[in-house]
Amino acid sequence: ILRERKLKKSDQITKNAAYEAVAPDDFASMIEVDRYGERSSDFDKIISDTHAHFWDPLDTKYIDFSENFDVENKLLMPEEFLPELQCPSVMKLDDKSKIKLANESFRWQMSAILHGEQGALNLSASLCHILKDQGAQEYAANQAREEARHVTGFAKYINSRWGKPLPVGQTL
């Protein structure tokens, strides 16, 4: 018979103070004076290393979203990356229908990634107001910044090709 027991702080798997968190509505704990003198250095190297690797999805030196691409007559991905094109029923389609199927399948994949990036952004941002350690907060904010770039990049790519992403559904 399993008995319920309340976990004590000493029973927790992670014992690093950098991961100490408060309830989302506990702002009073976040402005305790002593908290400001207790910043861990656990994330400092990761944070400093990321500064050189940030990119701007709106800068054309990375990706030029204004380049035209004919999604009706050209594949966005190499054919070998699209296993659905090898299905016997699909192989009977004319070239234009195969291209449409392949590019819509790729749109679905890009939409799934975009929604995942949005989830990563929301999660990273939500950690900023519950992690008590300022180093952990800065790392979470840094990660939120990076995820926001991913959301912008994928959204711009999808919008430039199809106008908008596919919505989240039961399979996405």
Spans of features found by a protein language model:
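Terminal targeting/low-complexity segments that flank the catalytic cores of oxidoreductases
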Residues: 1-125, 129-137, 161-167, 171
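Alpha-helical transition-metal enzyme core signature, strongest for iron centers
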Residues: 113-121, 143-158
